[in-house]
Amino acid sequence: MPSHSRSRDRYRGRDESEPERDRRHYSRRRYRETDYEDDELDDDDYDRRRRYRRDDVYRRSRGQSRGYESHEYHEDDANEYDLAGEDPAVPLRRSRGDERERSAGAYDDYDSPRRRDRHRDGDRRRRHRAYEAEGSPPRGAPDHRRHRSRDDRRERAYESEREARRHRRRERGREAAAAKHQSSDSTNSGSHLLSADALAKLRSEYDKEDRSRAKADAKAEKKQRRKRPVVADQPRRLDPFPEETPRGQSKGRIVSGAYLEEGRSPEMKVRHRGGGGGGGAGSKWRDEGASDSDMDGAEGGTPFWKKKKTWIAVGVVVVLLAIIIPVAVVVSKKNNEKKSDSTTDDTTPRNSNLDGISRDSIPDYAKGTVLDPWTWYDTMGFNVTFTNETVGGLSIMGLNSTWDDSTRPNDNVPPLNEPFPYGSQPIRGVNLGGWLSIEPFIVPSLFESYSSVDGVVDEWTLCQKLGDSAASRIERHYATFITEQDFADIRDAGLDHVRIQFSYWAVTTYDGDQYVPKISWRYLLRAIEYCRKYGLRVKLDPHGIPGSQNGWNHSGRQGPIGWLNGTDGQLNRKRSLEMHDQLSQFFAQDRYKNIVTIYGLVNEPMMLSLPVEDVLDWSTEATKLIQKNGITAYVTVHDGFLNLSKWKQMLKTRPDRMFLDTHQYTIFNTAQIVMKHTEKIKLVCNDWHSMIQQINTTSAGWGPTICGEWSQADTDCTKYLNNVGRGTRWEGTFSLTDSTAYCPTAKSGPSCSCSSANADPSQYSDQYKKFLKTYAEAQMSAFETAQGWFYWTWHTESAPQWSYKTAWKNGFMPQKAYAPDFKCGDDVPDFGDLPENY
């Protein structure tokens, strides 16, 4: 193993080998006997040694070449390795007196350095001939390695001596010139000498000559390293060009650890970007510290074989592009044709109807407001002609002045301009939840990027966190989450009603509110026009009213109830009535009489916490106000989560044309979520069927009743369903104090898991799809014994058991809502080996 170079300096004489000491002794003797002023002798010796190394050096393999440990020194560099073999007691330069004494004497021919060098070179040639005559020892044999190593050391010593002599010769010349300039002797007077500028120019020429010689030496050395012996008795040949290095294999070489530590291995390379002598088509590998002209190849250019590879690569790329580009164009055209066949493009804003409209048509006072169509994310389907007209204080901007109510969704339903036979024909509708009133479990993408530290759990905190970007981000959600295509699909699924959620900030906001104001209003109006286009009737549903009616995230703000309760309870009561005053004036227009056929007061007021009488009084007052303003639609009041049997005695003296709205789920009740698949279907067809049928009558119940929300979800596994960051009853992670899992196999096993319920619907088994479809059809059958139903909800990002659209397209919802395969009274089908914990 090579010795660490610094160790050789530090421990000289203790760990060096006998050949090393011989080399140092020989070097000292050479320093004493050499005439440092004999320039011609130095050059002759150097040239002779170069020829010797080139022509007669021992045959070595490439891996043993001395080039792996050799490196260039600049002639002016002071390097510790150059001095390693010298005796500190022997001065590098003799005094002037010694030099004059030596120059005065004459050398004997036998003792002259030239004679000794000739004898030494002759001895070496004779030794080489003797080795060749006897046959070279095997590669790696001990004596071969020892002789080669000793010669290598001596050759390196010669090179070091030559560099040192040249350095000292130059210094002596400079000192002599300086001494002459300083002399007062007329012989040495400055008037007989060159000027300082001339001397500087002369030194510059010397330096240039030295650099040129050093560069030539480096090039010769590099060429020497590329040679290798083939066999002992055959001439040398150039190494073949390197083959492609396998990927992952290092291109580096093993060198002295000291050299690597110093960063001075001759094979260490760095990569330079672009440029450089060969044309810069790609990055070039250069020796560290080398200039561009030192690259492989003549005069810094790229070798032919590399150029050939480059041209081949360029040709391949050109051929591939010639194939790929036409294919891409064809595919792009096909995709564009497919997109043009659809009614909407869900990903990009559609603003083509602004073409031909001048920005100057918008008054200065309206520019940059909700009345300025150039600020709208999506203008398709809107009338972008400016108007500041309002009805009930609410803008009609975006509406067309004409409409057509002759459409119907299917042949089972009368057109819009004919009355719908409520009471004799059931409603088959769907909700647009999570759209204009945002809910985390329906659109989790709006909430997933925040941590629990951010506290983003509802629309209030979302808008607060978004800050100035809230309006643009939320309008993009409005424009893309529900589009015209959704209304066409709702019609095609056999549905005939749509329950549209919106909140009070569509109408107005108050000091301190974080919500985005009024933008959702125009999307509500456009949605109604899309419903008109496809013959769908509308139920309006205020999901969030001032102060929050239940404190849940879908009311806008999760937390305490501030409506009819708390410090601002009465203020928010007044505000909510003002909201209905404006809304009822607007929707009492003739254009809405045939399409807005059901008008909701408030979604899910928490009557288990609020004073029941206060809620009933507000409901009566609001209904009278609405009807006074001209609303002829049915007005709905929610059951407030009270037992339906209690409603038999409530609001018995109420205004006409009112519906009771109830929401039925099995997953939020721990006694029902643990039921097995067949038991849940029997619960719906036996208990719910009779309950809904009874409450729908005025004699034994309350009167006309609809089911405004239900789903086919049989677990509460959906992300964020129980609030952001809350667990599930199904797996026992819902309660902070109770880890009981509520699923059919919780006690007997296997353990409950949400992985199956939350899987992609394409992975649902046929048995599970059969259950989900039967479970949905059973609920349809039960709710159709009253006024009908609205499924919750039409579209979700990732909750298939809550999305009518996903179920319909994946085969676990009837293809036509009016033509189910199962109804209560039929035999419950066998679900095979469907696991109960699925």
UniProtKB/Swiss-Prot annotation:
One of its GO terms (biological process) is glucan catabolic process. GO terms for cellular component: cell surface; extracellular region; plasma membrane. Glycans are attached at N383, N388, N400, N553, N565, N643, N696. The active site is at E604, E709. Residues 1-310 are cytoplasmic. InterPro entries: Glyco_hydro_5 (IPR001547), Glycoside_hydrolase_SF (IPR017853), Glycosyl_hydrolase_5 (IPR050386). Residues 35-45 have a biased composition (Acidic residues). Residues 332-838 are extracellular. Belongs to the glycosyl hydrolase 5 (cellulase A) family. Glucosidase involved in the degradation of cellulosic biomass. Active on lichenan. This is Probable glucan 1,3-beta-glucosidase D. The gene is exgD.
